[in-house]
Amino acid sequence: RWCAANSAPGSWLQVDLGQAQDIQNVRLIWEKANGAYQYRIEGSADAKDWKLLVDQSKNKEVRQVTPHKVNAKNTRYFKITSFGAKPAYWGSFWEFEAHTGALPELPRKVVKASQKSTNAPPKTNEPRVNPPDGFNLTVFAQPPLVNYPVCLTAASTGELFVGIDEQGSLGKEKGRGRVVRCLDTDGDGRADEVNTFAKMDHPRGLIYDNGQLWVLHPPYLTLYEDTDRDGVADREKRLVSGISTDYVGKRGADHTTNGIRMGIDGWIYIAVGDFGFYNAVGADGRTLSRRGGGIVRVRPDGTEMEIYNWGQRNILDACIDPYMNIFTRDNTNDGGGWDIRFSHVIQTAEYGYPSWYKNFPEEIMPALADYGGGSGCGGMFYHDTRWPEPFGHGVYTCDWGRSAVFLHNPAPNGATFDAHQETFLAINRPTDIDVDGSGRMYVSSWQGGGFSYSHPNVGFVVQLTPKNHKPEPFPDVTQLSDRELYALLTGPSQVQNLHAQLEILRRGRNEQRTKALVKLASDSGIPLAGRVAAIFTLKQLDGPAATANLLKLSEQPNIT
């Protein structure tokens, strides 16, 4: 297989036949069956003076096998120059043939595969997904209402927000991105109401809480607000600008900035692809610049932006557990032994990409495991004691290249963890994953799509629940008493803990809340995740005034 260096026109391959021959027919077998490849073929006797034989530089016809009659007398060398493809595939082919006579017949399986080539969209896009044992699965949303799903976030109360980018990773046309809001009003596991919540280019990461939707759409982090709760954003505020490079306009959103997750510590964590950024400006005017990839974090209001760690390639999400351990599926997929890594991310650590980790491993923070080829996408840590073991406390990572969602149950080992991975869900080209407050999981798929817009019938979203778990409606936290919020803050689900915390913080500081949080943090009978949530809530609620109580808590032998 030969592949162009990138999607830009001009990459070429030179073929030497060994001796000059009179060539009458040539044939290319391209990698993709649904690509309209654009190319030129030239011939030469001496590799200096070239004659144009085939010009398909403006081709729009979808064909995987492209035969051509040529008049190439006394030709030893051929040059195939790629000008890209529609959709935005890189030029790549399996085979180039040159014959002095007629073209030989191709093997039947090659002909059969190439006959799938067509300029028309597929008539069906039947979701290809294999649910894990012990789980119920429904197709929650699919075209035409929901297609090209890049990212998603589940509201605690069950609404699902899906980031749609018809331009994919390499398309550059503006006006093709949006976030849709999906509702299942009758509880059958399928969305029956879908509307556009907000429009923007290249949505890559979403967080929703209480009418507010944070959207990472490179080069911006924007807060969209639905103040009248009609399901459509009516206000927006730019929190961070320049959190990418100008390659968004030149190359598309690939390798720019990606998923976002909110931790119980009061920060939004941004997965930064390896193009980095050179003029990221927060809401408070703070400016950062750094090439490469890793994690940046920022407060929900766009202030205090800072680099958390660095030296990763194209991570698409940060998976945060209740104790603020962070894991990533590192898309270090350059080939030649540069593969998918699973990492425990530690603040200030350097993970070595691209300069160190292959040849100077002793100078970097090592990954927990290397899993070979793949294409890591969205991920999350999910803690919920209502789910059966081992599914209720683990890292879930999507791998687009391997068409699977993996479950990781990393076991503590000193200051870090031992790696673990098993296949959780077989699903075609998964892109993102999230869970709502009732314990319903959602996974999006890019099935049927390429690297930019090709046709409308692309992608779907599924919903999963354990068979022994009956989802209970998650309450409107704004209508709960403080006592009820404390129960959710220390409750079984990481999602519940976070959204209870956010409501407590909205209500503001008073003496009763401070005392209640100190009591929760001190109670050894409360699950550890709940006590940790109480400590982080206390600090965010009381600010510097929390120091005295935090010092007293640190004296307790069961608080470390």
Regions found by a protein language model. Give the residues of each.
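Beta-propeller domains with acidic blade repeats across secreted/periplasmic ectodomains
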Residues: 30, 61-62, 106-487, 495-506
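Cysteine-rich, disulfide-stabilized extracellular repeat modules
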Residues: 9, 13, 22, 46-49, ...
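Disulfide-stabilized cysteine-rich extracellular repeat microdomains
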Residues: 22, 46, 55-58, 85, ...
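Aromatic, loop-rich ligand-recognition surfaces of beta-strand-rich domains
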Residues: 1-112
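Amphipathic alpha-helical scaffolding segments comprising HEAT/armadillo-like alpha-solenoid repeats
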Residues: 479-487, 509-522, 542-554
